[in-house]
Amino acid sequence: MENISKIKSAKLGGLKSQFKLAPAVRMPVTFEEIDKNNPREAAVLALFYPDKDNKTCFVLTERAQYKGVHSAQISFPGGKIDKKDKDLSATALRETEEEIAVTDVNLIRELTKTYIPPSNFYV
């Protein structure tokens, strides 16, 4: 529980921190520059759970193979916002249920949006 409290209160690094880990070819941009591209919205869930030894693990999935830019990539469960989703948290929960059949989830917090240029998604 102590770690959850720390996660809830930790300062987010924001867009600046994301570019520290981005490929060198991805130039830093501002939220305003990203918004000019009219990105589509999506959400993912970083799902943490204890293993049999009570060590913290998290879920990754492998995307299906198709002719898109994210074919067969390793990812968090998630996907595009749907008109019936009330917000991005609802999107992440719905997509997680669809992809890995997990329904009993306690959300801790949202993180800074991440822009994915190849598919023009804000996640």
Residue ranges and their predicted role:
Residues 1-75, 80-123:
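N-terminal leader/linker segments that precede catalytic domains of diphosphate-processing enzymes
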